[in-house]
């Protein structure tokens, strides 16, 4: 036993609050840690890291409870350092800079900024924590206009593997800032504060939601992939196709311009198949954000387990990958399955691949697919169905997104980080040479 004491809001197994503390957004990842430390400041994080090392206890850091695969932000029998109580935001309106503690969820952050007249590309799921999403890149329907979340990261405060509080920006620990802009959460330090560039929001924006009969998914997808990556970069759009039983096939997005202009831009999509609904409206900017991201309880808790996998589409999909998608959605055996797409390009693609750790700058679109279940007896079949799609899709996609990880990926360094993996390993060796911050698919230090 060491001399360091745990500080902050500490909950051991068996204490009041433990049952709530173990709940994550995805029940699939739930485990039973020894202790949770709900840090109130960087010193609590530092003490928890030192305590874990002194007591030889595995450790993880958690922000929004939104890790999508096992043992990433929680660990059985270990310590979970949860930063969700650290959720303050300081906005410098004159310089368009937001200093943000890493425990705040995306929803309250985006909506608070919108009310103050600013926008930022903070993702499309309001319960996700800013702590994790930033490190992996982070994107949403505004990213074609203003870049990835990580592209807007100017500085950070982190706690290293020895419990030292360090800062990184363009003039101090620049290599750590580079790695933190796409290198994945929890690898180099446990972050407690970010400084972001934010952008003046327009007074209004135009949003849309278009719904088609599920049976028209091939027609809709073919039209979407030929249109979405090349349309005006002020337009961000995702396409989501659910299981055949559910029957939903829809596109939703935002345009930083007028309704008249958007209707003109949407013509190729509106003329695909026979939409059953097309809701297009100009709203005050904060209301547009509410349209895209309705409020959800925080911390978020899904009522079903979910398995994800992800990839990038660099070429138009032929009939073969589209038929793989359709069969997956037709054969869904759990509670739900879906394919999600978002268009790429614009500001994202203007950043060189090696300027930050985020490598995937030039695909046409991003895609992820999921299967969900409530009954434990359905788990194996749903895990297998997601993996089968991953294998079948290999000829048609490239890479994978570290924020939507899949532990079936063996060559994860290349898949997540491309040619940037070697430099990330060198930076890991500098800031965490003993590999204290290790977890499934964490970056190993170079030797």
Curated annotation (Swiss-Prot):
Domain (FAD-binding PCMH-type) ranges: 29-201
Single GO MF annotation: FAD binding
EC code: 1.21.-.-
Required cofactor names: FAD
Keywords per UniProt: FAD, Flavoprotein, Oxidoreductase, Sporulation
Uppermost EC category: oxidoreductase
Localization: Spore coat
InterPro entries: BBE (IPR012951), FAD-bd_PCMH (IPR016166), FAD-bd_PCMH-like_sf (IPR036318), FAD-bd_PCMH_sub1 (IPR016167), FAD-bd_PCMH_sub2 (IPR016169), FAD-linked_Oxidoreductase (IPR050416), Oxid_FAD_bind_N (IPR006094)
Domain of life: Bacteria
GO terms, biological process: sporulation resulting in formation of a cellular spore
Family statement: Belongs to the oxygen-dependent FAD-linked oxidoreductase family.
Protein's name according to its UniProt entry: Uncharacterized FAD-linked oxidoreductase YvdP
Originating organism: Bacillus subtilis (strain 168)
Lineage: Bacteria, Bacillati, Bacillota, Bacilli, Bacillales
Gene name of the record: yvdP
């Amino acid at each position: 036993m060491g001399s360091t004491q745990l500080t902050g809001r500490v909950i051991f197994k068996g204490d009041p609050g433990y049952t709530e503390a173990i709940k994550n957004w995805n029940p699939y990842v739930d485990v039973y840690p020894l202790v949770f430390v709900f840090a109130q400041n960087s010193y609590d994080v530092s003490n928890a890291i030192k305590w874990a090392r002194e007591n030889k206890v595995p450790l993880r850091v958690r922000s929004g409870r939104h890790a999508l695969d096992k043992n990433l932000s929680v660990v059985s029998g270990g310590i979970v350092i949860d930063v969700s109580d650290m959720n303050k935001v300081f906005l410098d309106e004159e310089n368009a800079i937001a200093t943000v503690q890493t425990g705040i969820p995306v929803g309250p952050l985006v909506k608070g900024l919108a009310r103050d007249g600013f926008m930022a590309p903070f993702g499309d799921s309001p319960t996700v924590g800013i702590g994790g999403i930033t490190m992996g890149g982070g994107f949403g329907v505004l990213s074609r206009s203003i870049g990835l979340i990580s592209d807007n990261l100017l500085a950070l405060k982190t706690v290293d593997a020895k419990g030292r509080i360090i800062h990184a920006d363009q003039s101090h620990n620049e290599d750590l800032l580079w790695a933190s802009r796409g290198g994945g959460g929890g690898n180099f330090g446990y972050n407690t504060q970010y400084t972001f560039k934010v952008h003046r929001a327009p007074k209004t924006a135009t949003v849309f939601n278009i719904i088609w009969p599920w049976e028209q998914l091939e027609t809709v997808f073919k039209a979407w992939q030929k249109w979405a990556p090349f349309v005006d970069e002020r337009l961000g759009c995702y396409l989501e196709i659910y299981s055949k039983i559910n029957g939903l096939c829809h596109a939703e997005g935002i345009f930083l311009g007028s309704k008249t202009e958007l209707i003109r831009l949407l013509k190729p999509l509106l003329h695909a198949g026979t939409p059953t609904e097309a809701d297009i409206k100009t709203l005050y900017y904060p209301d547009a954000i509410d349209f895209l991201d309705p409020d959800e309880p925080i911390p978020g808790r899904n009522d079903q387990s979910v398995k994800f996998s992800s990839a990038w589409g660099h070429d138009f999909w032929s009939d073969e990958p589209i038929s793989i998608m359709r069969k997956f959605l037709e054969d869904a055996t759990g509670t739900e399955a879906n394919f999600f797409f978002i268009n790429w390009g614009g500001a994202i693609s203007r950043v060189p691949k090696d300027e930050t750790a985020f490598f995937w700058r030039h695909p046409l679109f991003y895609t992820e697919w999921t299967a969900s279940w409530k009954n434990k007896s359905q788990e194996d079949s749903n895990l297998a169905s997601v993996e089968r799609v991953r294998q079948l899709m290999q000829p048609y996609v490239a890479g994978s997104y570290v924020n939507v990880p899949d532990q079936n990926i063996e060559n994860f360094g290349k898949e997540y980080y491309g040619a940037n993996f070697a430099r990330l390993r060198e930076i890991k060796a500098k800031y965490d040479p003993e590999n204290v911050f290790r977890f499934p698919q964490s970056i190993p230090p170079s030797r």
